[in-house]
Amino acid sequence: MLLGASGAGKSTLLHLYRKAFPDAELEDRTLRPILYISLPSRVTVNDILSGLLEACGDPEPQKGTARSLLSRLYGLTKSLGVQLIIIDEIQHVLPEHTHRRTQEAADMIKSIMDRSLIPFVLAGLPHGNRILTDTVKGKHSEDQLIRRFNASVQLKPPALGSNAWKNLMAVYQKTIGVPCINLSSDEMLKRFYLASNGLHGFIANVLEHALESTDGNQQICMTHLSEAFDVSSYADLIENPFKMSLPQVERALALRANV
């Protein structure tokens, strides 16, 4: 399993991995080494099967019973040479009031793995691991999905003051493509950490909005970053770190660390 908070970089990591193993067009067929789907909310087992069939290129992915959908999926994954199936946003199989849907999804994934011998990566928010833990009770050990996913990776943001955090901001500095305030200075490292909690998605969001407010020739400055933060999803949660004085930023970081 690949788990992490929203904005931790799961989608970026999965995208880069898929990009490393693209489809290959042969004379008689397409090879698709990685099959990827992202689940919508309130998803059912049939929705998952239909999504996998659509990713395989099935012309009528929603047509048929669960049994017929499974049968077609086995045939298509074999002809496409699928070597890995990735299901993103796995937390959406978790119901609010009953474990039945979770158990059905777990049983379906286990059946596909057992018959096709194709490994799965399940990705999502940290509580997505309940698809493993909520389906243990009442199951024989050989039937439990948790036995098939005995290795989980938790994506966590780098710590403020770490080389990883400084290196991350240096990468953004290099890739932003326009003149920009020094993102890896001690001051900006603190401001961005308060703004994003170290999460990649929020950093990218602020920088994208800041970039949009320039004409491509202006240097991105504190004013652009401040305006960008005001339209971000964090704006209603904390005071704008790009408007605060540096001592205020440092106090806010200290308070957060002690919570």
What are these model-derived regions, one by one?
Residues 19-30, 57-59:
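Post-Walker A helix-loop "phosphate-sensing" segment adjacent to the P-loop in P-loop NTPases
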Residues 32-43:
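A short hydrophobic beta-strand->loop->alpha-helix junction that borders the nucleotide-binding pocket
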Residues 143, 160-166, 171-259:
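C-terminal alpha-helical "lid" subdomain
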Residues 15-19, 204:
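The feature captures the helix immediately C-terminal to the Walker
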